[in-house]
Swiss-Prot record:
The keyword Cytoplasm applies. This is Ribosome maturation factor RimP. The gene is rimP. InterPro entries: Ribosome_maturation_RimP, RimP_C, RimP_C_sf, RimP_N, RimP_N_sf. HAMAP family: RimP (MF_01077).
Amino acid sequence: MSKVTKKVEELVKPILEKYGFDLVDIEFKKEGKKHFLRVYIDKPGGITIDDCQLVSEELSNKLDIVDPIPFSYYLEVSSPGVDRPLVNDRDFIRNKGRVVDVFLKQPIMNTTKLTGELVEKNEDVLIIMIDGENISIPFENVKKVKVAIRF
């Protein structure tokens, strides 16, 4: 974690705690000639545009005072997006009960992709429910887990 992202985390956490939001990730990147500070937030049930705006305004005010970045940049506050894989324990807890796609290293039930409701994830096992039946998947066999996109 860079000094910038560490400082931003210190500034944003009290804001998120006040509203009951979770910090998912912070990125500070240069793209072309522009710098972007991206703060990804979430909450049970999903984050709204109004939630992002609220955090963006409060964080922007704090950043103007503390000024941890000595050059111009764009601040973006958003949800993690549906394409982001579930990575840490908070991701799995936050998405419990949602339908997920589990991509496997080795096939289970003759497939390397299972779709089901996320029941639980612990150190060793990921449990999803498929057609009312809990399926335990050794976490060492899990390549990636993403929230399933339904149309």
